[in-house]
């Protein structure tokens, strides 16, 4: 397994454990379509939480991966969410929130940084 894939999986698992402790239930993990991949999709009380996980070894100028979440990535992610909703119609009436989880590596006492992504205008796409 490539180093970046291991880091990504470790970061996703760390975020998933935390969210499960907070009552969220996993619906999809590493779901992909032609637009890209959704790292985590979770559900709780008629709410959907889509989490894009960025794991980095150092915070530095990159802020643990924040610079990788550019406008192009955001557009692809929103399109992927539309595809996911089209293939999971049961969740169409759920409210939707997209967050970016910035995970420091290696494991440390550093907390996760959560950034809520606003302005979601997503329609189910094919």
UniProtKB/Swiss-Prot annotation:
InterPro entries (alphabetical): Restrct_endonuc-II-like, tRNA_endonuc-like_dom_sf, UPF0102_YraN-like
Membrane-spanning segments: none
A Pfam family hit: UPF0102
Gene3D superfamilies (UniProt xref): 3.40.1350.10
GO molecular function annotations of the record: nucleic acid binding
Family under the similarity heading: Belongs to the UPF0102 family.
PANTHER family in the cross-refs: UPF0102 PROTEIN YRAN
Protein name: UPF0102 protein P9303_16141
């Amino acid at each position: 397994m490539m180093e970046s894939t291991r880091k990504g999986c470790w970061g996703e698992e760390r975020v998933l454990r935390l969210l499960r402790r907070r009552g969220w239930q996993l619906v999809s993990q590493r779901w992909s379509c032609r637009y890209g991949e959704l790292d985590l999709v979770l559900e709780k009380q008629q709410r959907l939480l889509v989490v894009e996980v960025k794991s980095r070894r150092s915070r530095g100028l990159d802020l643990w991966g924040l610079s990788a979440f550019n406008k192009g990535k955001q557009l692809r992610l929103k399109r992927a969410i539309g595809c996911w909703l089209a293939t999971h119609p049961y969740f169409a009436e759920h409210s939707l929130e997209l967050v970016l989880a910035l995970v420091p590596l290696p494991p440390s006492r550093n907390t996760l940084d959560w950034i809520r992504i606003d302005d979601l205008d997503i329609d189910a796409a094919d």
